[in-house]
Amino acid sequence: MKQKLLQLAHFFGYEVAGYRNFRGKPDPERPWEDDQTFLTAYDAVVNHTLVDRKRLYMLYQLVRQTASMEGSLAECGVYRGGTALLFARLKSKEKRLYLFDTFGGMPETDREKDIHRAGDFSDTSLSHVQNLLHGHGNVVFRPGFFPATASGLENETFSLVHCDMDIYSSVLDFCRFFYPRLARGGVMVFDDYGSLSCPGAKAAVREFCAGQGTFEIYLPTGQAIIWRS
């Protein structure tokens, strides 16, 4: 029963953590507990995202890792703007952040590969996310269907790109567009790779990597990353 409940929580994107006493020292499996910069950012975004704390902490570390690298940031699959706000808070003023989403729900999906259906996650809007990120500079909204909304960015370079698109065709389009435009040492992060509700996301990443002769790194958080060497 316990295992089934844990699996159910993971299916819907939640983390279940037990209590362990480390005599006042940080839990090595919860390194954010003594990272005040992250905790402050987390408090600002937690009510605007479905991404759990472990995955947010991974994104936080990757933003810091790529901070001095050339290239912009991008997120595809913004939903209500929580992770976009995390990026906007952490990035330098000089770095540009591109945000791609329909801001009205999912596009058509592949019934053989995806569980989600067209219109899922429609409880958001462009104006909602714009208001959430108000005051953060160098943020560019690209509303509509990706990859058409990436038109004009063919010569852009990216240091970190975050994919939270859930479905096969969108994730594959993401890989095809961003991978050749990653800076050396740049990273693609896939939020839904290990999610039981997003089998098409994992299938797309694996298909793309097989075609490129590269490999994704599956993280204990359920995310996956691809580095550009």
Please give the residue ranges for each predicted region.
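N-terminal pre-P-loop "Q-motif" helix
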Residues: 54-58
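Short amphipathic alpha-helical segments enriched in hydrophobics
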Residues: 16, 67-70
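S-adenosylmethionine/decaboxylated-SAM
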Residues: 25, 32-50, 60, 69-229
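Boundary detector for helix-to-coil junctions that initiate low-complexity/charged tails
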Residues: 1-29, 47-50
